[in-house]
From Swiss-Prot:
InterPro entries: Vps53, Vps53_C, Vps53_C_sf, Vps53_N. It comes from Pongo abelii (Sumatran orangutan). One of its GO terms (biological process) is retrograde transport, endosome to Golgi. Keywords: Acetylation, Coiled coil, Endosome, Golgi apparatus, Membrane, Phosphoprotein, Protein transport, Transport. One of its GO terms (cellular component) is perinuclear region of cytoplasm. This is Vacuolar protein sorting-associated protein 53 homolog. Component of the Golgi-associated retrograde protein (GARP) complex, also called VFT (VPS fifty-three) complex, composed of VPS51, VPS52, VPS53 and VPS54. Component of the endosome-associated retrograde protein (EARP) complex, composed of VPS51, VPS52, VPS53 and VPS50/Syndetin. EIPR1 interacts with both EARP and GARP complexes and mediates the recruitment of the GARP complex to the trans-Golgi network. Interacts with VPS50 in an EIPR1-independent manner. Residues 398-412 have a biased composition (Basic and acidic residues). Acts as a component of the GARP complex that is involved in retrograde transport from early and late endosomes to the trans-Golgi network (TGN). The GARP complex is required for the maintenance of the cycling of mannose 6-phosphate receptors between the TGN and endosomes, this cycling is necessary for proper lysosomal sorting of acid hydrolases such as CTSD. Acts as a component of the EARP complex that is involved in endocytic recycling. The EARP complex associates with Rab4-positive endosomes and promotes recycling of internalized transferrin receptor (TFRC) to the plasma membrane.
Length: 832
């Protein structure tokens, strides 16, 4: 019974002592302990096992028990001490609270005493300073009254003097007096309710109005709208009148400026009327010469009359530009058919020179916001084409590949007058664009004629495989056009010029590059695509001559240069054109065209070497391999293949020295074409004896070594072949070697032969297996059981369609080739 009660007590105690993880974590942080007994996950069994790890340790059990009892006794003592200490805690707390409350009450009493004393002190200070404050207010009011009376006296006297001086046109004295009167009047704004003050204010406004009308009348008299200018220099009266106008309503100043400029340019409107000979573009110099003379005349006669901050000379020049732009636009619309490109460029050049003259002479401070927005200069460009204006001498000295790669010059400062007149020519720049279209068309025709007359680059010279000189000439001309057009406009005309550039880049690619690629022909006539793919039995394969190989390489190098330069051209055009039009600059199509030329050139080189090797592969498949009695040196067909490789590859490599990556592409494409074709012809070697298979294996190894050495064959400098190329050759030719090793293996026992086939050929399938059985000369009846065994032992492919697809791509069958040939022939006939 006692034991049950003890168990219940222990369970209740454990339930009470079961703490939440948060509480347990807080206890561990406040009272860190390394004692296992303090851990929340304490396990009594593990603790006992730690104390007594072995049976021998049980000998010390009494000592351990005594230590634990001693520890329990100490804990009990500590607990009793703590419990006793908590007996009087409640009473002590109540006593401390009462003491705190008493202290707070005493503090409140002291604060109240301090507040009462402060209020008494404040009242005492107010009583002492009451009389002093009244005296201070009286002094302030008296000072204000005296100041106001003085201002009133000054205002009344100033108004009287202002009216008298206005009548006598004493503008020099009026300028100083008026400003003072205006300043004094500002002090009386809050007194405008007083009739006398309001009356003085109205007299000042009336005097200002009278002054404005009087000054305008004086200027009208001195510079009448009709008739000639007043002889002699300006009077001091008008100079002082301008100082007064600076103080008056800004509209007075604007009216004076407007009338003076209008009178100053009246002669210009008469001299250069639309019906006058000097108004046309061929005499545009006279317009600018006239305004330059007028500016000199203004500085001599009227430079001191107007205040410097009015910038009258610049205002005259700006108004002249606006009038000239309007007049030129009007006359060009009327006589649009008479505008020729030389005349247009002449007028634009003279106009831009004049705008540059204005930028050097004036700051552009008088240009209004609207004018600046309308005539906003194009964004600064870092295009190296802007370093100077090209001349014929410079074009002759221009390097072939340096035109678009010159270092950038520092950005030139903006011209605030750019386009202020030349903007009127932009609607007529189509004449310039059409002229460039015609010139580029003639340039392309000249390139075609020169190529026919001079022929392709000669082999065994520095020219072999070099970039065609016509390519550099084309981009030099493009540079000239770009610089010229960017000086004329950076808006829509630049987009139109870009379209012209695109047109003739495509024409150059078609007429000069693609159009001059050699055609593959035979002695009997044209060579069709099928004849390139089919085997040549008894017919001589037409190879490209040395000159033709050099020409193909030269066209490839030229296309590569055009591709890189066109990409740079696109970047420079985007730098030149307005920001809003950048999205419309896109030469991707032209770059793709040059990429197509490069691919076509490489394909021609591959087809030529591939076709040259076809007769040798055909000879290999026609040999009687079952009659070979001993293994000797490499077979004649291997020697023939190696001979063709040694003839073509060094020529191609030397001519593509400047475009190494495309030579690597040629090697890769040839390997991808030759190796599957070699394996296809290998399957045609049937039946084959053991010795014949050994000879074929030797030949295959020889071809493998030659192909691995193909990038540097015949070269004095031995370079390691690119890893991508080596991987293709090793993978393809190793497959051919594995096929021959399977052929050489005995076909009995069947299980061993099938397992050996699966092991050696990772891309094994029943189709390849049957071809190997045909090479061994086995009968169909023998093959059926072996094929069935193979199907049973073949692992299931992850995707049958993908597996078979990849195998068919790697080793196309003759049936697949003939089917492909027929489709291509039908497509060609349909196109023709």
């Amino acid at each position: 019974m006692m034991e049950e009660e003890e168990l219940e007590f222990v369970e209740e105690l454990e339930a009470v002592l079961q703490l939440t993880p948060e509480v347990q974590l807080a206890i561990e942080q406040v009272f860190p302990s390394q004692d296992p007994l303090d851990r929340a996950d304490f396990n009594a069994v593990e603790y006992i096992n730690t104390l007594f790890p072995t049976e021998q340790s049980l000998a010390n059990i009494d000592e351990v028990v005594n230590k634990i009892r001693l520890k329990i006794r100490r804990l009990d003592d500590n607990i009793r001490t703590v419990v006793r200490g908590q007996t009087n805690v409640g009473q002590d707390g109540r006593q401390a609270l009462e003491e705190a409350q008493k202290a707070i009450q005493q503090l409140f009493g002291k604060i109240k005493d301090i507040k009462d004393k402060a209020e008494k002190s404040e009242q005492m200070v107010k009583e002492i300073t009451r009389d002093i404050k009244q005296l201070d207010h009286a002094k302030r009011h008296l000072t204000t009254s005296i100041t106001t009376l003085n201002h009133l006296h000054m205002l009344a006297g100033g108004v009287d003097s202002l009216e008298a001086m206005t009548r006598r046109r004493q503008y020099g004295e009026v300028a100083n007096l008026l400003q003072g009167v205006m300043n004094v009047l500002e002090h009386f704004h809050k007194y405008m309710g007083i009739p006398q003050i309001r009356q003085l204010s109205e007299r000042v406004k009336a005097a200002q109005t009278e002054l404005g009308q009087q000054i305008l009348a004086d200027f009208e008299e001195a510079f009448p709208s009709q008739g000639t200018k007043r002889p002699g220099g300006p009077s001091n009266v008008l100079r002082d009148a301008c100082l007064v106008a600076n103080i008056l309503d800004p509209r007075i100043k604007q009216e004076i400026i407007k009338k003076f400029i209008k009178q100053h340019l009246s002669e210009y409107l008469v001299l250069f009327q639309e019906n006058q000979d000097v108004a046309w573009l061929d005499k545009i110099d006279r317009r600018y010469a006239w305004i330059k003379r007028q500016l000199v005349d203004y500085e001599e006669k009227y430079g001191r009359m107007f205040p410097r901050e009015w910038c009258m000379a610049e205002r005259i020049a700006v108004e002249f530009c606006h009038v000239t732009r309007t007049e030129l636009a009007k006359i060009m619309r009327t006589r649009a058919k008479e505008i020729e490109v030389k005349l247009l460029l002449f007028a634009i050049q003279r106009t831009t020179n004049f705008e540059g003259f204005l930028a050097k002479r004036f700051s552009g401070c008088t240009l209004t916001d609207g004018t600046l927005k309308k005539l906003e200069s194009p964004p600064p460009s870092t295009n190296p084409f802007l370093e100077d204006e090209p001349t014929p001498e410079m074009e002759e000295l221009a390097t072939e590949k340096g035109d678009l790669d010159q270092p950038k010059k520092p950005k030139a400062p903006d011209n605030p007058f750019h386009g202020i007149v030349s903007k009127c020519f932009e609607p007529h720049l189509y004449v310039y664009i059409e002229s460039q279209d015609k010139n580029l068309g003639e340039l392309i025709d000249r390139f075609v004629a020169d190529f026919k007359a001079q022929g392709p680059p000669k082999p065994n010279t520095d020219e072999g495989g070099a970039v065609l000189p016509s390519c550099a000439d084309l981009f030099v001309y493009y540079k000239k056009c770009m610089v010229q057009c960017s000086q004329l406009s950076t808006g829509e005309p630049m987009i139109a010029l870009t379209t012209i550039f695109q047109k003739y880049l495509r024409e150059y690619a078609w007429k000069i590059l693609s159009g001059n690629l050699p055609k593959t022909t035979t002695s009997s006539g044209g060579l069709t695509i099928s004849s390139l793919l089919k085997e040549k039995e008894g017919s001589e394969v037409a190879k490209f001559t040395l000159e033709e190989l050099c020409l193909i390489c030269s066209i490839l190098s030229t296309a590569e240069y055009c591709l890189a330069t066109t990409q740079q051209l696109e970047e420079k055009l985007k730098e030149k054109v307005d920001v809003s039009l950048i999205e419309r600059i896109n030469l991707t199509g032209e770059m793709d065209t040059f990429s197509t030329v490069i691919s076509s050139s490489i394909q021609l080189l591959v087809q030529d070497l591939d076709a040259a090797c076809d007769p040798a592969l055909t000879a290999m498949s026609k040999m009687q391999w079952q009659n070979v009695e001993h293994v000797g040196d490499q077979s004649p067909y291997v020697t023939s293949v190696i001979l063709h490789i040694k003839q073509n590859v060094p020529i191609i490599r030397d001519n593509l020295a400047s475009t190494r990556k495309y030579f690597t592409q040629f090697c890769i494409k040839f390997a991808n074409s030759f190796i599957p074709k070699f394996i296809t012809h290998l399957f045609k070697c049937k039946p084959i004896s053991m010795v014949g298979a050994e000879q074929l294996l030797l030949d295959t190894h020889s071809l493998k070594m030659v192909l691995l050495d193909l990038p540097s064959i015949g070269s004095q400098v031995v370079r390691k072949a690119p890893a991508s190329y080596t991987k293709i050759v090793v993978k393809g030719m190793t497959r051919a070697e594995m096929i021959l090793k399977v052929v050489m293996a005995p076909h009995e026992p069947l299980v061993v032969f099938v397992d050996n086939y699966i092991k050696l050929l990772t891309d094994c399938n029943t189709e390849t297996f049957q071809k190997i059985l045909d090479m061994k000369g086995l009968k169909r009846s023998e093959q059926s059981s072996m094929l069935e065994l193979l199907r049973q032992r073949l692992p299931a492919p992850p995707s049958g369609a993908e597996s078979s697809g990849s195998l068919s791509l790697m080793a196309p069958t003759p049936e697949q080739e003939s089917s492909r040939i027929r489709k291509l022939e039908k497509l060609i006939k349909k196109r023709l």
